[in-house]
């Protein structure tokens, strides 16, 4: 994977973000997602690569495009595996709320964990706490470790948690330590990545979210040197989601076994979820967020704000791109 390919991967998320942003605030989350999917696949098709979707919009019979196993690209060139979420935070986009973005992770063939469409317990933390916090420790223990590693008082730590009923006890425990809780309604990828940067005001992500997004978060944090661990959740009593109504713990365990997962309780480290030699994360804002701005439509141009993180050169590049419309008369700087 070279720098030219990485630039094209950036353009993939930019085009997905622009397509989805045209429906920001319209209350049409499914349409916004579909627009992003189509734009992402179209741009991928123009890249000289043998691409494969390992995490996408669902199984082949569930999604018309970017389904798991779909081949993308020209069919020649380097082999690249992708984990994609063309519109992360569809509800956020539909309601013009902060934090929606187009994201993906990429690596050479075989470099990304093919996460099942399950839930995942996650722990993300800054590089200073890597290998010191642990997903098997209590929230209280991890918060005290974070405080010591970062040199920040417990009362000044901000812990991001998805605002879900299943996290009632977790939130209560965090607050009992004196740390602050920042609940989010959707989209935990950006919060996880924010843990990898100092000065974002986000010190840790805890709790249960979607497993596929966990792989994308792991790819970014691995490249940043941050901490990420994930553990699959298969018990409906733990997940506490309407999506799993009627499912059983035993049935989910059987599904995991069919997928080749022999140890359903395994704790995955970042370098297991994103194990490739060359791992790239790319994200482009649909709406304004913690790390970058959303798409801005001007009379003569469209502006995108994006982030690319790569293990190729251990870099994180924030990119502000002006997409000039044909016949443009003037281009706004800001």
Swiss-Prot record:
EC number: 3.1.3.11, 3.1.3.37
Gene Ontology MF term list: fructose 1,6-bisphosphate 1-phosphatase activity; metal ion binding; sedoheptulose-bisphosphatase activity
Lineage of producing organism: Bacteria, Bacillati, Cyanobacteriota, Cyanophyceae, Synechococcales
GO cellular component terms, semicolon-separated: cytosol
Described function: Catalyzes the hydrolysis of fructose 1,6-bisphosphate (Fru 1,6-P2) and sedoheptulose 1,7-bisphosphate (Sed 1,7-P2) to fructose 6-phosphate and sedoheptulose 7-phosphate, respectively.
Protein name listed in UniProt: D-fructose 1,6-bisphosphatase class 2/sedoheptulose 1,7-bisphosphatase
Catalytic activity: beta-D-fructose 1,6-bisphosphate + H2O = beta-D-fructose 6-phosphate + phosphate; D-sedoheptulose 1,7-bisphosphate + H2O = D-sedoheptulose 7-phosphate + phosphate
Subunit structure and binding partners: Homotetramer.
Residues reported to bind substrate: 88-90, 119, 164-166, 186-188
Single biological process term from Gene Ontology: glycerol metabolic process
Annotated residues for binding of Mn(2+) 2: 85, 88, 213
Keywords: Calvin cycle, Carbohydrate metabolism, Hydrolase, Manganese, Metal-binding
Similarity comment: Belongs to the FBPase class 2 family.
Protein origin, superkingdom: Bacteria
Record organism: Synechococcus sp. (strain RCC307)
């Amino acid at each position: 994977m070279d720098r030219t390919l990485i630039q094209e991967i950036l353009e993939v998320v930019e085009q997905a973000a622009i397509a989805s942003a045209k429906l920001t605030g319209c209350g049409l989350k499914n349409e916004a997602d579909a627009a992003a999917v189509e734009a992402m696949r179209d741009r991928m098709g123009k890249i000289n690569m043998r691409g494969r979707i390992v995490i996408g919009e669902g199984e082949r019979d569930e999604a018309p495009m970017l389904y798991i196993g779909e081949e993308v690209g020209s069919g020649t060139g380097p082999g690249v595996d992708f984990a994609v979420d063309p519109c992360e935070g569809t509800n956020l986009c539909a309601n013009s709320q902060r934090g929606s973005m187009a994201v993906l992770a990429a690596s050479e063939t075989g470099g990304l964990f093919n996460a099942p469409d399950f839930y995942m317990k996650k722990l993300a933390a800054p590089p200073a706490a890597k290998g010191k916090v642990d997903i098997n420790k209590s929230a209280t223990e991890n918060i005290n470790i974070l405080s010591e590693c970062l040199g920040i008082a417990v009362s000044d730590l901000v812990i991001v948690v998805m605002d879900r009923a299943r996290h009632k006890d977790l939130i209560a425990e965090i607050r009992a330590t004196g740390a602050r809780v920042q609940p989010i309604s959707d989209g935990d990828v950006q919060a996880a990545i924010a843990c990898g940067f100092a000065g974002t005001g986000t010190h840790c992500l805890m709790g249960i979210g979607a497993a596929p997004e966990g792989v994308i978060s792991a790819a970014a944090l691995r490249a940043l040197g941050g901490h990420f661990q994930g553990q699959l959740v298969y018990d409906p009593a733990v997940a506490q989601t309407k999506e799993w109504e009627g499912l059983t713990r035993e049935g989910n365990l059987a599904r995991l076994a069919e997928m080749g997962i022999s140890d359903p309780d395994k704790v995955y480290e970042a370098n297991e979820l994103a194990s490739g030699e060359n791992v790239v994360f790319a994200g482009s804002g649909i709406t304004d967020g913690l790390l970058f701005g959303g798409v801005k439509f001007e009379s003569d141009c469209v502006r995108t704000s994006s982030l690319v993180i790569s293990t190729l050169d251990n870099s994180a590049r924030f990119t502000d791109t002006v997409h000039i419309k044909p016949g443009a008369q003037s281009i706004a700087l800001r």
